[in-house]
Amino acid sequence: METAITMITDDRFYYRGHDALVLATTRSVEQVAALIWTGDFSAESSLFSRALSDSMLARYHKICSSLAGLTPLEAFQVCLPLVALDDIAAYDLRAEAVAQTGTRILQLLALVATGGQHATRGIAHTVQQGWVPYDERAKALLSAALILCADQELNVTTFTARCVASAGSTPYAVVCSGLSALQGIKHAGQTERIEAFLRETDAPSNVRTSITNLLKRGESIPGFGEVVPGFGSVFYPVGDPRGKLLLELTAEVYPQSPAVLLAQRVTEETNTLLGERPTIFFGLVTMARALNLPPGGAIALFA
């Protein structure tokens, strides 16, 4: 399956002809954003040369207190329309200007997700400093996760955003529309179900019992045909390479993490019993648990 940006094969996927699995461990979030938006890695320096304006930061700081208690996705939808009031350049819909607006939105989302006050050295660094400041190893993991989720061109979230973009809306409005779709049960709801399943399972010794209980109850996620939450993908018949890589990277950094050990057992049992492999959502939830990210952290990275 192929679009203007992404190509999916049975076991790989590509951004503008570049293997996304390789990009996840060799390039920065900013470089991959430049590739997706312009087709050129080197455009990173010009696109990300400007920080958020003082007026945008002032607006963000003013509403920070009202974001307390919200999940990152909820906070995004509160913050974006308000900060957009101070970004008049967002109404410039020429391709280069839209890409530059995209960089400002990325910087803003990184701050909102983590409750940060000022953008730091790159998107991944901002997220790591806000969520896992005590562990520099988390930066590479978070960067890989963001890159693996950089383009969602084939799902309903992106389709919604494209429809809004086709009406000549600003990038802020486009992103807000995509976030609305993302909060549905097929995305945010899916990560919540995975989290609930892992909490219920609790330990590797309970995995087979938990899977058996799911099978007996006949539970599934509408539209995905999954029995075990986070497994099976219609786009990847031999397994979602994004989920596989993210699980491997997390295990390399935190091999003894209870979250990793549980995920490994779930993966083994599900493949043995059902022949299904983990999706990107399962990888994100496992990484979020290993890093002890706040509620909603996994789906925020997907966004």
Q: Residue spans of the language-model regions?
A:
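Hydrophobic alpha-helical bundle cores within soluble ligand-binding/oligomerization subdomains
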Residues: M1-A303
